[in-house]
């Protein structure tokens, strides 16, 4: 038997045809969103505040410290924020201390940092009442990158390098003309690489060669004509960065040091340090080279690796364990560019063994010359306080050194030399066995944990670059996922916070520098975080990564939360992105879906995470693999799972899913299809180190829901995955007969269903709420009577007793969503799928929502399909449908539209707008469905033009006198002073009023300035499927309904069953999506057997299984049958493929698009008709359409279209009058666009004449209307 029955949740069961004997559950599909936001709340904010703490005044008198932070609970619930159109936020407060440095006094207060939008449990944010999703961004990781391009002229490869931080100045290496190597700092002009090396602290060519070793490539770097040293090189480097500006060497050194080695200006982040240490590790380059000298343990003189030995992986492992012996000091602390110079250091260690610092010189009062602190005085807290009290009289150097942000003892501890790991190797061996090409390899200090770049890193990167010319080291593939990482919501928010806090920091510094401690009540008077609030608000409302949630169905919702975009701030520009960055890369395997991406300009730049993908702490995407063990000559699959990044995967040989195992989990085949370093091949089973966990780990959730995916062309699979996300929720959802097994998890994790938070019994259920009573963890009594004893088994009877006695602490209440409007104007309705007394486990699905059935994804309906033509109506992929599907609401959907009206306070003296039933100049019939306030009654049926809310606006701005007011009240002559500004149903709309929301300033509702009342009317419309609606299958087979036939005209089977849908058979072979044919055969068999089937992607029903199930269902082996013409009753000549296909109705509906105009608005300048359905516009008659009329010689029609039907203002009014009066149509006048053209020429200073042929007059400035002729005075 090639299948097994599997239960999905409690309600759904399928016959699963998966061949894999192991089944790894999918991880929570939206956990990356929730986990990242939680990290930001717990750690991200804390790290940021530490980076900005303390903020010090310019004179050093006052400091502001951020001690801690806390969030207040949100003011409104999620439901309330949606109704009131406000954001779901919590106030973020920071505990702030203002310190008087001179006296040590402090003042504390809690200050509002910002209103922080909170993530809901489903991974969304609610901003201004609408749900939004922040998608993850994929960017190039901070690291050191090298690239090589073959130069045809030079007949060799030229290399370039980039040292890229997360934030800060880039260092770039490149080869210029005449084979000279150059360096650039911070995108400045380039300088010779030799000068850049000098600037790092080397004083002579000999010093450089002593570190880097002698080599031909290094010799070519030096400019032999000039004498260069460290100081001159620093000044030159500064000059290149600052566009030729010349400064003293101390200023240049200080500037370069700040640019590269200051944490505030240069940030690698954790990921940058990890990647730097990985790339610049000397041992990575040394593998497969020959050691140039003995590797000796200096402690016992033991030779650990002999000279000339090949450095294999085993030898490299020995070096790794003893890598501290490779460290050499390049610069001591005194000459390290990262440290202050001798002139800047004003304290020294008198006794090396003691941690005590003494002043180098006398510290004097710069105003009076008085000695404040004598030379050789021990620096302690008293001395520092004494200097603080005299801060205004100190020299700038003194105050910077002793009273800077860093403690001087900490500075001394941090002042270290530059250490690098150095190894000399031979790279080549000739035929005689002689080694040659000696190369010096320099790696960075692997102990380094600093978040900024170090001199050790820079030296190692230069050496790596030079090594490339000696064939040591590797170039990087920037499109490899080992070099690209995800910025999740937590990191994106942290970056925005940094921008906001940086702007706020300057403002705070200015405030505290102009304030005195005694004059302020607390830090709240000095601190203003308006900049931060503005940045956060802008990010959530305007950023390309913060998107309006695609709420049309659960799959669309889930896919958007797992979406990965390369666009946005710090990402790729869509217009400049090449093919390489868009293309599928072998490192995407199991991490990014190679199928699901948009068609059009964003192709390849927006992708989706694969089903099992996770993101590690550095932002690199991981995918799981089973460990493979080699034991007793057998290759065994372990159940231990490792999550590997693309970099970690490089070294492994990974078996592709589909391998055959025996009962002991050992591989049966000697040769296994596997991947190594991205390439697929056949390997011996004893070489395998890992194995895929599932065949579907390659693709995304949307793609894995396509059955028989392996039989479809990739471009059609892409369309299938994308179109499923456009499926409209149907009135009666139905899960697919032929599924893939992911439908349950996709629906559960999407966020549109209610999941039980704990186990228990259902003690109350209706359409509004579900109550689950859970098992108490202690004995429960009431009035001496025991309601539940922990020794007893917990039953429904006991749960009911607890519920009836109102024990709320043991009850969990779940509120269902009823008739809500989604972001895409579709209906959101949740219905209970549990019954009273049912036992529920934690994690069970309690309700079915839009496009779900029994807890499974249900985007469409299972319909009987025949691949045949019918009178040419299914030409070009058109679809012919049965009228029965329309009658029985098979593809009917409900849509809800929102209409809004506000009453405003008008200008002074003009009064205010009013909501009223007394609408002027309308009959009683127009207001029959309005209540006494003038608002439509819910449940009323409305059509276009009907009044929804009666509103009147005063005309004129004259305030009536008291006597006039009295007359108006007595006579009631409102109609004369008020105009009708009621909210009406727009053109082409209508339906049933579902609900009305009324907000008023009087009721305490928060409304925009000047608005007194706000009324929202929701109209529900039932849309039956219609000709012109777009439908699709799951295989990219899309089409538009061309004809809906009555049941009696449709072809029928031998048993009289009519066909539901007819598809064009020509749409299959050229599109190469054969999956749809297999689906209809399997669907027909499963329907006859009364079962549902799961055929997982790459691991489902094969030819043998399909034949067996068709035999079981008594169907023909080829799936074809004789059909009879419904009109004549005669059989068709050929047997026809008939089966059951799952087809969805897409959101491209004809009701939204069909539109016609007779009269309507015109654009102001050109006076041509507006365009589009929203503006009630006309159809564009473009250049090519004009050519068509040329071709027919239809001169009068053409003239009419280009004049009176377009922008001839006078002509169209005269034509209208002529049609009404029945007179002859007049000649057209000059079109308005021609007048606009003339005005544009005149605006350029050109003299334009328009000479009338009969009168010879210049009519260029003549008025549009002949007043005399028209009868005007």
Swiss-Prot record:
Q: Name one Pfam family in it.
A: RNA_pol_Rpb2_45
The keyword Nucleotidyltransferase is assigned to this record: yes
The UniProt entry's GO biological process terms, in alphabetical order, are:
DNA-templated transcription
Cellular component GO terms held in the UniProt record: DNA-directed RNA polymerase complex
Q: What is its EC number?
A: 2.7.7.6
Q: Does the keyword Transcription apply?
A: yes
Which keywords does the record carry? DNA-directed RNA polymerase, Nucleotidyltransferase, Transcription, Transferase
- The top EC class, named as a word, is transferase
Can you state the subunit structure given in the record? The RNAP catalytic core consists of 2 alpha, 1 beta, 1 beta' and 1 omega subunit. When a sigma factor is associated with the core the holoenzyme is formed, which can initiate transcription.
Function description: DNA-dependent RNA polymerase catalyzes the transcription of DNA into RNA using the four ribonucleoside triphosphates as substrates.
Please identify the protein, giving its name as recorded. Answer: DNA-directed RNA polymerase subunit beta
Annotated source species: Aster yellows witches'-broom phytoplasma (strain AYWB)
From which lineage does this chain's organism come? Bacteria, Bacillati, Mycoplasmatota, Mollicutes, Acholeplasmatales
